[in-house]
């Protein structure tokens, strides 16, 4: 059951599996809802609810992306109400095995990303109470995260970070800063070390993004700009400052907040909260995007949240608020 309190968070494991996972994020005990997916027609079957051992926080209000992330064998989910995140093992039947809870190293964790054995958690912080931070972890032999500590990033008070993710090859870490109107990129090593913070400034209201599945240094970001809401593609080589490759949107691209791409990178979608719509972009080998069309439901009410694409690029899944 997809309810209003579901966080903006989908996860489809990086394997030829059939699981779909959603974080509930209520003001109380947090949980992950698990579904199995019919690979032929895409339909979902409910598996069960799995408590994270942490707490959600409705005050986040959807200002987050990638609150759940999965590898071939594990799933990780943030608990913004208890300042920690949970590790699960993935079972063959789509169910989850609780492994443990780890402190996020900050306040209000809203996003999480993993590359190899390295995890970074984005803590949104709380204005006047705690600063935002991006905290690194490595997976131990027991499969549980251990804090790196040395490479934690502390942000300015007004940053309001909403999303963190690695690029395709894990060589760049991308952080979207909604309050600072900026996108940060870091060079990342296989042991989790971060160097060379490069900032792309003047990017109005970035909320959610995704990596390019084919270009190692290209990422996409949805900009909830009051004047020109749109999707942008950026290039972050780590040598020069990150730059905007292209920018595109349609009249129905109102309040774009989340993004997803097919495995071949030829299709990119933005999920547009205010319009309740989806915008399709054509992805080019150069890293540029071009707006193609929009899916606008019969009801014009808001509520389009996170989106995810299956591993074959055949099915798109969208989380809807205000619907069950």
What are these regions (language model features)?
Residues 53-71, 104-118, 153-172, 201-219, ...:
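Beta-rich, blade/repeat-based domains predominating
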Residues 35-43, 88-95, 136-145, 185-193, ...:
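Short loop/turn segments immediately following beta-strands, especially the blade-tip
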């Amino acid at each position: 059951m997809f309810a209003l309190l579901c966080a903006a968070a989908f996860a489809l494991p990086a394997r030829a599996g059939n699981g779909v996972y959603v974080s509930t994020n209520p003001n109380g005990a947090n949980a992950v809802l698990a579904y199995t997916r019919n690979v032929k027609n895409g339909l979902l079957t409910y598996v069960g609810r799995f408590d994270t051992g942490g707490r959600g926080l409705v005050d986040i209000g959807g200002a987050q992306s990638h609150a759940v992330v999965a590898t071939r064998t594990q799933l990780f989910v943030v608990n913004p109400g208890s300042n920690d995140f949970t590790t699960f093992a993935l079972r063959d039947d789509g169910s989850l095995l609780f492994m443990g809870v780890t402190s996020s190293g900050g306040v209000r964790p809203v996003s999480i990303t993993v590359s190899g054995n390295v995890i970074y958690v984005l803590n949104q912080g709380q204005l006047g109470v705690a600063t935002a931070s991006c905290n690194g972890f490595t997976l131990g032999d027991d499969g549980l995260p251990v804090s790196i500590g040395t490479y934690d990033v502390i942000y300015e008070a007004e940053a309001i970070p909403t999303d963190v993710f690695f690029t395709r090859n894990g060589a760049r870490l991308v952080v979207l800063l909604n309050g600072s109107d900026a996108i940060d990129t870091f060079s990342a090593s296989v042991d989790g070390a971060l160097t060379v913070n490069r900032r792309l400034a003047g990017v109005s209201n970035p909320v959610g993004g995704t990596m390019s599945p084919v270009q190692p240094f290209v990422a996409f970001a949805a900009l909830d700009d009051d004047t020109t809401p749109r999707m942008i593609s950026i290039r972050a080589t780590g040598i020069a400052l990150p730059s905007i490759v292209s920018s595109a949107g349609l009249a129905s691209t109102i309040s774009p907040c989340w993004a997803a791409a097919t495995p071949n990178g030829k299709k990119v979608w933005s999920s547009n909260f205010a319009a309740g719509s989806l915008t399709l972009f054509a992805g080019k080998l150069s890293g540029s995007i071009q707006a193609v069309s929009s899916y606008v439901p019969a009801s014009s009410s808001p509520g389009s949240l996170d989106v995810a694409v299956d591993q074959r690029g055949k099915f798109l899944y969208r989380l809807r608020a205000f619907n069950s």
